[in-house]
Amino acid sequence: QIVLTQSPAIMSASPGQKVTMTCSASSSVSYMHWYQQKSGTSPKRWIYDTSKLASGXPARFSGSGSATSYSLTITSMQAEDAATYYCQQWSSNPLTFGAGTKLELKR
């Protein structure tokens, strides 16, 4: 199975700061998908097919990458962006998730 490694595991950012987190796949995948999860809630699809913004996801979010290297970027951190972000692939069975990047707000 394809192992997804997210980096960093935990990070903090101030309001307005640019944020980038990465997801590395153990083998090449066609697309990467990203989910946002806030404490006590179910994960929400945030970015799909590497770079397409899901419904409800703000335009300050973007995704990029190919093969084994993918990233999620927030151009300007907002308080509501504090959450855990998971990458996911289904190019190869079984579907797998990364362990997540926890993004905290630095005040």
UniProtKB/Swiss-Prot annotation:
Residues 56-87 are annotated as: Framework-3. Residues 24-33 are annotated as: Complementarity-determining-1. Residues 1-23 are annotated as: Framework-1. SMART domains: IG, IGv. Residues 97-106 are annotated as: Framework-4. GO terms for biological process: adaptive immune response; immune response. InterPro entries: Ig-like_dom, Ig-like_dom_sf, Ig-like_fold, Ig_sub, Ig_V-set, IgV_Light_Chain. It comes from the Eukaryota. Anti-2-phenyl oxazolone (PHOX) Antibody. Residues 49-55 are annotated as: Complementarity-determining-2. GO terms for cellular component: immunoglobulin complex. Residues 88-96 are annotated as: Complementarity-determining-3. This is Ig kappa chain V-VI region NQ6-8.3.1. Keywords: Adaptive immunity, Disulfide bond, Hybridoma, Immunity, Immunoglobulin. Residues 34-48 are annotated as: Framework-2. It comes from Mus musculus. Disulfide bonds join 23-87.
